[in-house]
Structure formats: structure tokens, C-alpha cells
Amino acid sequence: MEVKYLDRTEIDRNAWNECVKSGSLNWVYAYFEYLDGVCYEQWGALVAFEGTKYAGVFPLPFRKKWGHIHYVYQPNFCQQLGVFGDFDTLSLEGYSTASFLKLIPQRFLRVHLSLHPFLGDVLGSKKKANFVIPAGFGPEKFNKDARKNLKNLSSVVYRETSDIWAVLKIYDEAWGRENMFTWANTYEGFEQSLILLDSEYYYAFNAFCDEEIIGAAVFLVSGDRLHYVCGGPTNKGREMGVVHGFIEHVCLKFPTHKIDLEGSSIPSVAQFYKKFNPEEEHFLRFEQNLRLWR
């Protein structure tokens, strides 16, 4: 097995997606089309080859400073990256997340990534909480406060939508000031990623109360897991606690799927997610000057 760095234009899209979809971790975050959107087509990758077959892939979104200094970063609306492919095969060949990190080309002077933990820990990384509701959970397993809020939402109706721009507008009005996102540098890329994807890989919906929209959300559909990637209430929705309804709705609509709430380093958000009695997983936050680390 040989690992090479490829620029985006050198990557075989079909071979890439086949590697991700048939691998141990079939997450939409790593699909070629999704990366193209959220990275604005500026990314490369480490690819492990078995002959001509892609056996493992490690996407590397990058930006440039002052026109020539390259650095790897974590895109918005893309919680975890890392190595994707057949983990058993990669492990047998002696590969891990840590070994892939050592192969990142030296021209990337800084690497800041959030990594999934399923191909080994990384020395020097920090473990971050990630909250996942197990498949089959319903509102009867939520805590008392969550169930109380859901009673106030009994008249709310949820309808699927293809208008991603409208969902993002609600999200921006709810959280944009805190996140400091901009349309040109953040939202347009995410919207484009969903346009490029087949609709089976995401679920977007609006929440209505008396035919008034009170919130909207987008979940990515990754095999048996949904990722809560984007959601926000209107002012009325905030008063009603409609985000509780988002979680209940997808738990009931997708009973065979885990619901990945994606954790939060903000204590109030983490406490909110704990209302739904999720299991706590973790991901790895890796921040290093690559030249020093090597």
C-alpha cells in the first residue's frame, strides 16, 4: 500500500466516493461533492492506494495566507474529518490517523483539524465531547424538562423543504452574530454542498405553528447516522423552545438512525443536548505546527 498526496484536480471522484461509501465510516462530510462545497473547491488529500484502488482517503481543506503560506483548517458545517476507508485493511497495513498526519506535505505549515477517533488517538490532540442519541430513542427517554417543552409544541408541524437558502437565513438570524459567519465565505459554500449532493444525503425541514415558520434545520444522512449540522429558531420559535421539537421530530422520523448532535464546547449548549439523554462520544481536536511536530 502506498500513500500519496493529490490535489483536488488529480482525484478520481468516483474512486473517492466509493472508498468513503464502502468504508468503515460512511459520512457525508467526506463525500467529494460535500467537500467541494464547504471548501470552495480548495482542498487536497492523502490517498492510500492498493494498486489503482483508493483504500483510504484523508481530506485536507486548505487556505493560503499572503498568497503563498498554506495551512490546513476545519471548514464550517463539517464537524469531523480524518481518514476514511476500510479501517481493518488500513490497520493491518500499519496505518492510523497519526501516521497519516505525519505524511502531510511540509508546505502546509499549520494543521488545525477536528478528527474522528475511530482509527486511533493522536498524541497532542485534545478530546472533545460529542453527543449521540442512540437509534430507537423516543421522547419517553428524554428528561423531564425536554418532555415539558415538547408538550408546548404539540401543534407544531414539520415539513420537508428544498429551499436551503431560506433555512440558512433563519439560522443566520438566530446565530449568525455569535458565529460571525458571512454569506460569501460560509453559507454559500454549505448551500452549494447540498446542491451538489443527492437529496437522499440530507434532510431539511421547516417548523410551522399556525402556518407561520418558527424554525428550520438541516441534518446530514450518513448511513445509519444523522448529523445535526444546522438549525435555528425564529424569535417566536425561541420562545416556544422549538429546537426541542427538531430533535423529537428526527428521532421519530428516523427510528433506525443515531442522531449525532455534534457536541459543543459552549456549556449552555452542551447542557441543552444532555436533556435528550445522549451517549457521550468524543472527537479529537488537533492543532499543530507541522514542521515542529514532524
Predicted regions and their residues:
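Aromatic (often tryptophan-rich) hydrophobic motifs at membrane interfaces
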Residues: 50, 54-57, 78, 95-98, ...
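Short histidine-centered catalytic/ligand-binding loop motif
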Residues: 76-91, 176-180, 232-239
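A gly/proline- and charged-residue-enriched helix-loop-helix capping module
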Residues: 74-116
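Short amphipathic alpha-helical segments
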Residues: 79-81, 129, 154-155, 257
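Short, high-confidence coil segments that cap the C-terminus of an alpha-helix
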Residues: 41-43, 106-110, 202, 256
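N-terminal cap/recognition module
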Residues: 56, 61-66, 70-82
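A conserved beta-strand-loop-helix scaffold within acyl/acetyltransferase catalytic domains
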Residues: 2-51, 60-67, 116-237, 275
